[in-house]
C-alpha cells in the first residue's frame, strides 16, 4: 500500500484490489502480510473519509471489491473447516478399520482373546464395550460383515454353514450378557441401572491392568471402586461383598476371553445339512430321534378280555368220502343236531339236487367203509342243551344239509 499521505478513493481502491489479488494467490506467507495491510487501511480510512471527494463510480467499485474479498474469505473459511472435519473423520475411520481387522496392536484387554473361538469378533467387541455391550445397528452390520468375511477367508470345512445374520448376532449378545454373568453383575451390584453399571465397569477397569473402553464418559468422574460398590449396594461394603464382586468379574472376563464349551456346536449344522441330502436308492433314511439312539423297550401286549360267549364246538364225526381232517371243521347249531351224519354231502348242492338223493341206497358200502370201522369206538360229544331256532331262509338257501333233516325226522 502507498505511503503517500494524500489519501483518496482511488488509492483506497488500489489497496483493496492488491489485497484481493494477493489473497486469491493463496501463498503460505500471504495471510500475515494481508492482515497487516488490512489493519493499516482500517486505521487510515476513518480520518480521511470526511475529506474525500464524492465519486459514485469509485465508491461502487470499492463496494464490489470489498464484497468479493468477503465472499472469498467465507469460502476459504468454510473449506478450511470442511478440511479439518474431513481429516478428523478419516483418522477416526482408519483407526476403526485397523481395530476391526486387527492391523494395529490390540488393546490390552484383548491380548489373551483367542482367535480360534467361535464369534471372535463379537467377543472382542463385547470386551471393548464392556461398560455397555449394546451394539448399535451400524456396529451390528459391521460385525456381521467381519464375521462372514473371516469365515470365508479361513475356509472352514463346514462350507454349508449359512452366513451370519443381524438378528442372530442380536440374539448372541443377549445370550452373552446373560451367560457371561454381565447381567448378574448389573442386577446385584448396579441395581439394574445401566448408568451405575457404566461407572462401576470404568472404575474397575481403571483400577486393574485392563484397558478401559476407548470412549471415556466425562460426565462420570473416575471414583474409587469401593465407594461405587458401597453406593450401589446402599450399605457399607464388606469383604465378602468385595470378594463376591471380584469372583463374578473374573468369571465374566474368563467367559469372554477364553469361552466355554458351547451347548450348540457345529453338529447342529451337520445335522441340518444331512437331513437335506437325498438318500441313495436302497439305503435307509437316518432318523436322529431318541427312539433310534436307544433300543426300544419291548412291552407285553395287552391281554384280550375273556369273552363270555361259548366257543363253537368242532364235530369229531369223520367224513365218509372226504380225506380232510375233521379237526379243522367248525360246528354250527345245525351240524350239532345231526353230528352222526357225514357233512361232506353239503358239497352236492352245486351239482346234484338234494331232493332226489337217497343216503341209504348204498347202506352196505357205508358200513364196510374203513373210516367207519376205524372210528367205531369213538365218543360223540354232547349236544348243546338249547339249539337256536332254525330260520326258514336258512333251509331255503341250503345252509342246513338235507341229510341232517332226513336223519333228524327218521
Curated annotation (Swiss-Prot):
Task: Establish whether keyword Aminoacyl-tRNA synthetase is in the entry.
Answer: no
Tell me the superkingdom of the source: Eukaryota
Sequence segments annotated as region (Disordered): 202-225, 278-336, 374-394
- Where DNA binds (residue ranges)? 107-184
Under the heading InterPro entries, the entry gives: HD, Homeodomain-like_sf, KN_HD, Ustilago_mating
Q: Where is this motif: Nuclear localization signal?
A: 276-308
* Region Variable domain between B alleles, annotated ranges: 1-110
**Where is there biased composition of kind Polar residues?**
306-336
**Gene3D superfamilies per UniProt:** Homeodomain-like
A GO cellular component annotated for this chain's UniProt record is: nucleus
Example of a GO MF term: DNA binding
UniProt-listed Pfam families: Homeobox_KN (PF05920), Ustilago_mating (PF05722)
Region (Not essential for B7 function) residue ranges read 333-410
Compositional bias ranges of the Basic residues kind: 375-388
Q: Which compartment or compartments is the protein found in?
A: Nucleus
Instruction: Write out the GO biological process terms.
Output: regulation of DNA-templated transcription
Q: Which UniProt keywords apply?
A: DNA-binding, Homeobox, Nucleus
Q: Give the span(s) annotated as Highly conserved between B alleles.
A: 111-410
Q: Which family does it belong to?
A: Belongs to the TALE/M-ATYP homeobox family.
Q: What does this protein do?
A: The B locus has at least 25 alleles, and any combination of two different B alleles yields a multimeric regulatory protein, that activates genes responsible for the pathogenicity and for the sexual development of the fungus within the corn plant.
What protein name is recorded for this chain?
Answer: Mating-type locus allele B7 protein
Q: Which organism's genome codes for this protein? A: Mycosarcoma maydis (Corn smut fungus)
Amino acid at each position: 500500500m502507498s505511503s503517500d499521505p494524500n489519501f483518496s478513493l482511488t488509492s483506497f481502491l488500489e489497496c483493496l484490489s492488491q489485497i484481493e489479488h494477493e489473497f486469491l494467490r493463496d501463498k503460505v506467507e500471504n495471510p500475515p502480510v494481508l492482515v497487516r495491510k488490512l489493519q493499516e487501511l482500517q486505521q487510515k480510512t476513518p480520518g480521511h473519509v470526511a475529506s474525500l471527494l464524492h465519486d459514485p463510480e469509485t465508491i461502487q467499485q470499492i463496494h464490489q471489491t470489498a464484497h468479493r474479498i468477503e465472499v472469498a474469505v467465507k469460502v476459504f473459511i468454510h473449506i478450511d473447516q470442511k478440511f479439518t472435519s474431513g481429516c478428523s473423520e478419516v483418522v477416526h475411520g482408519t483407526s476403526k478399520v485397523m481395530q476391526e481387522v486387527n492391523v494395529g496392536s490390540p488393546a490390552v484387554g484383548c491380548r489373551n482373546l483367542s482367535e480360534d473361538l467361535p464369534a471372535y469378533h463379537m467377543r472382542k467387541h463385547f470386551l471393548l464395550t464392556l461398560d455397555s455391550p449394546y451394539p448399535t445397528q451400524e456396529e451390528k452390520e459391521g460385525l456381521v460383515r467381519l464375521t462372514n468375511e473371516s469365515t470365508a477367508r479361513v475356509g472352514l470345512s463346514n462350507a454349508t454353514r449359512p452366513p451370519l445374520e443381524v438378528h442372530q448376532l442380536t440374539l448372541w449378545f443377549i445370550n452373552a450378557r446373560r451367560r457371561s454373568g454381565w447381567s448378574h453383575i448389573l442386577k446385584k451390584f448396579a441395581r439394574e441401572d445401566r448408568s451405575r453399571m457404566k461407572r462401576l465397569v470404568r472404575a474397575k477397569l481403571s483400577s486393574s491392568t485392563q484397558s478401559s473402553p476407548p470412549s471415556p464418559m466425562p460426565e462420570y468422574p473416575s471414583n474409587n471402586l469401593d465407594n461405587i460398590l458401597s453406593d450401589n449396594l446402599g450399605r457399607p461394603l464388606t469383604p465378602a461383598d468385595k470378594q463376591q464382586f471380584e469372583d463374578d468379574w473374573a468369571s465374566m472376563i474368563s467367559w469372554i476371553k477364553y469361552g466355554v464349551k458351547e451347548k450348540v456346536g457345529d453338529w447342529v449344522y451337520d445335522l441340518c445339512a444331512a437331513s437335506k441330502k437325498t438318500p441313495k436308492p436302497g439305503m435307509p433314511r437316518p432318523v436322529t430321534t431318541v427312539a433310534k439312539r436307544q433300543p426300544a423297550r419291548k412291552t407285553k401286549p395287552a391281554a384280550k378280555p375273556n369273552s363270555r360267549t361259548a366257543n363253537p364246538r368242532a364235530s369229531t364225526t369223520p367224513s365218509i368220502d372226504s380225506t380232510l381232517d375233521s379237526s379243522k371243521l367248525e360246528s354250527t347249531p345245525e351240524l350239532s343236531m345231526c353230528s352222526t351224519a357225514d357233512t361232506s354231502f353239503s358239497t352236492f348242492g352245486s351239482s346234484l339236487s338234494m331232493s332226489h338223493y337217497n343216503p341209504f341206497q348204498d347202506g352196505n358200502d357205508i358200513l364196510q367203509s374203513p373210516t367207519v370201522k376205524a372210528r367205531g369206538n369213538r365218543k360223540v360229544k354232547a349236544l348243546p342243551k338249547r339249539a337256536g331256532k332254525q330260520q326258514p331262509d336258512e333251509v331255503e338257501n341250503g345252509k342246513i344239509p338235507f341229510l341232517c333233516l332226513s336223519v333228524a325226522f327218521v
